Amino acid sequence: MGFLSSLGVDPRNAVFSSDTSEEQGRQFGKGRGTVDCCYPVKCMSGHYGELVFGQKQKLDILLSPMIYNLPSFLSGHVAKTLTCPRVMAAPENIKAGFIKEQDAFAEAGIKYVSPFVSLDEPLLVPKQLFNGMREALPGLTYEETAKAADAGFKALRDFSDRLRKKSREVLEWCAREDRACLMVIARPYHMDPGIGHEIEVDLQAYGYPILWMQYFPIDADLMDWAFGEDVRAGHIKSAFDIRDVWPSSYSSNTNEILWGAKVAARIPWIACVVRMSSYECGMDQPTYTPVQQIVERSGTLFFSFQDLDSTKPSGSVKIRVETITHYLEKYAATILNRKKAAMPPGCPLLPKA
């Protein structure tokens, strides 16, 4: 909302589609889907339909940017931070289902706006957004767009910083109480209850704190403690360098998935990693083996939920969750002791003497 608020849009007038659900797809996306094996992309039909057909108040603009690359804490340490090509092209792909027979946007009096943006190249973003939005927002100036883009980036940084701070508090609590926690390694859309099926919620109900890899704390003291020896030995150039395990570091989320495996292996109180992946995700498939090997070689438990799609198989998920918690109850203390014995001295997560 930082970008839109800076342009003068009242937050009360900004409407977001609801969480993904089968009902949403049936009610609003039926007959408008496109041929794509990527389940998260197919879900967008329901979201578009909900915004076009399911609102009590009339919408003026449907904003769905095509994002080429993403800002990442790994930027500058990896080759590129590109988005998945399917996700980048999804707005135009899904749009086709709403204009193939008649223009549903025009009939609803909605302007469809889909600017192409390179979010990891902030100097390009104002021009990209200005060119993509000036027809929909008469009177918009480049200067206003640049100021709004800065506000948007600041809002994103503030949001990430708040969540990373909370994650650090969780880790410090685990270190202080000598308790195990779990890390979820997945793509951002798996936080959507209709795509990730709230598997992490089921696990948390057993009393285990959950950390998401995207918001792991990256404070300098923690990074130097976890990766400093490898940096000084010349194995990697920085705490965020993944070339030792993933030389082809072009995809933003893939890069962060590999880095998440590395950091989970190094933090003693992360006793288990849970990997999530959607059905036939071509970007994830090459990472299955390296991620599992990195995690398991540290003695950390590893479980994966692959090929997630529209259906939550409640029975099998329940069995998997019970299996994970059984192994944690049985082995977590041993895992923590083994990882603590191997950790460098001076862990900043522990209370100072």
Predicted region positions:
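An N-terminal assembly and electron-transfer interface module characteristic of large anaerobic redox
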Residues: M1-A353
